[in-house]
C-alpha cells in the first residue's frame, strides 16, 4: 500500500520572493506527502547544484521550471511503483539517475523535493509523526536553538561583515522556555535599537540589521538586551557567531571592510580569540574561508577546545569532505543543510559521521525558506541537539519553532532539552 503512484512537482515562491520547488507524492493508499525546498544566499562552492532556468524573462533568471520538469518526467518514471518506506533505496535511485557528483543534471532542488515528500508520505502511511518516523522510539531530545538576532554580510545591507550574531539559550529548562528566552531578548533588542534611533527592520532570517560602528558594538548591544530581558549572559544565554568568512576572504586576506581591517589567518584568529575571552561566545561558524584549510587548522588548534567551530561552507553536508576534515582535525562541528547535498539519506549519513567522530551536528535552515518544517523533525529525529532556524520573527522561521513546540508537547515527559550539554565537543 506504500507504493508511489503519482508525483507532481511545481514552482512556488520562497521567503525572498524567489522561485523554489515543491513536490507532492501520492501513495497507493491515497496518502500524500508534500515538501518544499529552501535556497541559500551565501553558498559553499562545493554544494550540490540548485538548478535554475537562467531565463532572464522570468523571475530574473531564477525560475525552476527545468527542475520541476525533471520531477514530472524522468524522476517520476524512475520512482513510480517504488515503496515509499524504502527511503535509502529511493534516494539511491535519485542519485544514480542524476549521475553526477553534485546533482547538477537533475538539480538538487528536484531530488531533495522528492526525497522529502516521499518521507512525509511514508510517515503518514505509517501513522507516525515525521520525527518519530525518522528516529524511532529513541527520538526524544529537543534541539538547542541558535537564534540569529543581528544580521550582517550577505544577509543585510549594513557595515557588519560577519553574517550572523546569535543568542543561544543554554540555561533554559525546556525548548518551550528556550523559545521564550529568545523572544524576550529579541523584543528587548528591538526596543534598544528603537531608542537609539536605529533601524528595526529585519533581514532575510528575521534578525535586525542595524548600522553599528563595529562588531563589538553589536555584541555589546545584544548583551544589553539579554540583561534588559532579565537573563544572565553566559549562564542562561550564550552567544554564537556565523562569520561566513568566505564572503570577505580576498587574495589571502580577511577583509573586514566595515572596520577597515585586512588580516591574515593568524591575525583574524587572534581577534576571534580575543572576543571569545571577552564575551560568552560558545560557537563560531565558518570562522575561516572554505578553501583556507591552513587557516582552519590555525583556528582549530587555537580555539577548538574552547568553542564549537562549525563548518558550513567548509563541509557542505558532504561526507567525503567531512571525513577529510575529521582526519585533519579541522573544526569540531558540521552545519547540516539538506539542500547542500540533495537527499535525506545523504543528510543522515553526514549527521551520523559527525557524531561518531565526536563532532556536533547543527541542523540549519537557509536564508530563502518556505513554510516547510521538515528540518524541525530532522533535528529531533536524529537527536542532533542543536538547530539554527533564524530569529524570533517571520513566519517562515516561526514555522520551524512552532513545529518544535508541537513535537515537545507530543513527547511530553520524555522530552529532554540538553542546554549546554549539546556542546559535547567542548572540554
UniProtKB/Swiss-Prot annotation:
The active site is at residues 205, 337. InterPro entries: Enolase, Enolase-like_C_sf, Enolase-like_N, Enolase_C, Enolase_CS, Enolase_N. (2R)-2-phosphoglycerate binds at residues 163, 337, 366-367, 388. One of its GO terms (cellular component) is phosphopyruvate hydratase complex. GO terms for molecular function: magnesium ion binding; phosphopyruvate hydratase activity. It comes from the Bacteria. Mg(2+) binds at residues 242, 285, 312. It catalyses: (2R)-2-phosphoglycerate = phosphoenolpyruvate + H2O. Keywords: Cytoplasm, Glycolysis, Lyase, Magnesium, Metal-binding, Secreted. Pathway: Carbohydrate degradation; glycolysis; pyruvate from D-glyceraldehyde 3-phosphate: step 4/5. Its cofactor is Mg(2+). Signal peptide: none annotated. The keyword Metal-binding applies. Its main location: cytoplasm. Binds a second Mg(2+) ion via substrate during catalysis. SMART domains: Enolase_C, Enolase_N. CDD domains: enolase (cd03313). HAMAP family: Enolase. Catalyzes the reversible conversion of 2-phosphoglycerate (2-PG) into phosphoenolpyruvate (PEP). It is essential for the degradation of carbohydrates via glycolysis. Belongs to the enolase family. This is Enolase. It comes from Polaromonas sp. (strain JS666 / ATCC BAA-500).
Amino acid at each position: 500500500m506504500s507504493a508511489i503512484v503519482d508525483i507532481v512537482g511545481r514552482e512556488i515562491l520562497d521567503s525572498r520572493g524567489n522561485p523554489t520547488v515543491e513536490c507532492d507524492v501520492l501513495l497507493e493508499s491515497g496518502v500524500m506527502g508534500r515538501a518544499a525546498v529552501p535556497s541559500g544566499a551565501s553558498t559553499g562552492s562545493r554544494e550540490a547544484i540548485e538548478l535554475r532556468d537562467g531565463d532572464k524573462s522570468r523571475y530574473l533568471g531564477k525560475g525552476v521550471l527545468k527542475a520541476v520538469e525533471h520531477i514530472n518526467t524522468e524522476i517520476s518514471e524512475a520512482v513510480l511503483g517504488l515503496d515509499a518506506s524504502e527511503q535509502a533505496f529511493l534516494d539511491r535511485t535519485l542519485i544514480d539517475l542524476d549521475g553526477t557528483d553534485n546533482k547538477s543534471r537533475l538539480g538538487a532542488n528536484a531530488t531533495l523535493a522528492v526525497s522529502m515528500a516521499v518521507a512525509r508520505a511514508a510517515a503518514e502511511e505509517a501513522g507516525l509523526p515525521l520525527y518519530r518516523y525518522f528516529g524511532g522510539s529513541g527520538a526524544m531530545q529537543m534541539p538547542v536553538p541558535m537564534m540569529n538576532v543581528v544580521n550582517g554580510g550577505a544577509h543585510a545591507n549594513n557595515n557588519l561583515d560577519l553574517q550572523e550574531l546569535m543568542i543561544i539559550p543554554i540555561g533554559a529548562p525546556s525548548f518551550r522556555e528556550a523559545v521564550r528566552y529568545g523572544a524576550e531578548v529579541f523584543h528587548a533588542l528591538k526596543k534598544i535599537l528603537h531608542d537609539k534611533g536605529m533601524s528595526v527592520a529585519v533581514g532575510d532570517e528575521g534578525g535586525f540589521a542595524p548600522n553599528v560602528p563595529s562588531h563589538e558594538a553589536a555584541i555589546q548591544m545584544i548583551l544589553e538586551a539579554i540583561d534588559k530581558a532579565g537573563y544572565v549572559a553566559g549562564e542562561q544565554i550564550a552567544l554564537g557567531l556565523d562569520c561566513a568568512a568566505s564572503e570577505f576572504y580576498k587574495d589571502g586576506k580577511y577583509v573586514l571592510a566595515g572596520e577597515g581591517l585586512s588580516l591574515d589567518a593568524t591575525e583574524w584568529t587572534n581577534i576571534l580569540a580575543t572576543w571569545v575571552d571577552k564575551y560568552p561566545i560558545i560557537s563560531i561558524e565558518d570562522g575561516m574561508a572554505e578553501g583556507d584549510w591552513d587557516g582552519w587548522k590555525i583556528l582549530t588548534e587555537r580555539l577548538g577546545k574552547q568553542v564549537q567551530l562549525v563548518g558550513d561552507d567548509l563541509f557542505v553536508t558532504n561526507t567525503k569532505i567531512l571525513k577529510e576534515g575529521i582526519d585533519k582535525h579541522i573544526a569540531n562541528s558540521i552545519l547540516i543543510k539538506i539542500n547542500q547535498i540533495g537527499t535525506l539519506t545523504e543528510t543522515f549519513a553526514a549527521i551520523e559521521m559527525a557524531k561518531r567522530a565526536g563532532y556536533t551536528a547543527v541542523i540549519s535552515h537557509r536564508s530563502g525558506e518556505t513554510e516547510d518544517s521538515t528540518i524541525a523533525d530532522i533535528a529531533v529525529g536524529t537527536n542532533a541537539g542543536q538547530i539554527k532556524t533564524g530569529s524570533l520573527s517571520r513566519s517562515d522561521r516561526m514555522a520551524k519553532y512552532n513545529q518544535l513546540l508541537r513535537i515537545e508537547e507530543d513527547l511530553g515527559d520524555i522530552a529532554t532539552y540538553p542546554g549546554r550539554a549539546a556542546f559535547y565537543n567542548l572540554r
